[in-house]
C-alpha cells in the first residue's frame, strides 16, 4: 500500500488567556467555533465542506458531549461536514492532527481540520458526594 504525504497548510487560534479572564463566559464550543470561523475567513472556506473536522478536548463539560460537531454547525463551514471529538488526559489536539494526517496518508480524506478546545473557566468541577447532596437539597428549597 502506498501512502501519501499529509501537510499542514495553515492554522488559526484564539489567543491564550487566564481562566476567569476575557473568555470567562465562553464555553469550549464558543472558543472552537471562533477558531473555526477564523480559519474559514483566512482560507476562504465559507460554505465549504472539508472531509472531516476533528478536535480534542481534555476538560469536556457534559453539555459538550458532541463538541466538534456543534462547533461545525455553529461555524461558517458547510453543516454537512463530518466532525468528531477525541478525548484523553492530554495532547488531544496533537492526537487530532495525527488522526486526520493518517486519514489523508491512507487516502481516506483530502482536506481535514484538526485542533483542540478547552476552557479552564468552564471546566466541570467534581465535588464530594456529601457536597453534591447538600447542593441538590439546597436547590429544592423554597424561597
What positions do the PLM features span?
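Glycine-rich phosphate-binding loops at beta-strand->alpha-helix junctions
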Residues: 57-63
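Acyl-thioester C-C bond-transforming condensing/cleaving domain
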Residues: 1-6, 18-47, 64-65, 69-143
Amino acid at each position: 500500500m502506498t501512502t501519501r504525504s499529509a501537510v499542514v497548510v495553515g492554522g488559526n487560534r484564539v489567543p491564550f488567556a487566564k481562566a476567569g479572564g476575557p473568555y470567562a463566559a465562553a464555553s469550549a464550543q464558543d472558543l472552537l467555533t471562533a477558531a473555526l470561523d477564523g480559519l474559514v475567513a483566512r482560507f476562504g472556506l465559507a460554505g465549504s465542506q472539508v472531509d472531516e473536522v476533528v478536535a480534542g478536548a481534555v476538560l469536556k463539560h457534559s453539555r459538550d458531549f458532541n463538541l466538534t460537531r456543534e462547533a461545525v454547525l455553529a461555524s461558517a463551514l458547510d453543516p454537512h461536514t463530518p466532525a468528531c471529538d477525541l478525548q484523553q488526559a492530554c495532547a488531544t489536539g496533537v492526537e487530532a492532527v495525527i488522526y486526520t494526517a493518517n486519514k489523508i496518508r491512507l487516502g481516506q480524506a483530502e482536506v481535514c481540520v484538526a485542533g483542540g478546545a478547552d476552557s479552564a473557566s468552564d471546566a466541570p468541577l467534581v465535588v464530594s458526594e456529601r457536597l453534591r447532596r447538600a447542593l441538590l437539597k439546597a436547590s429544592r428549597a423554597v424561597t
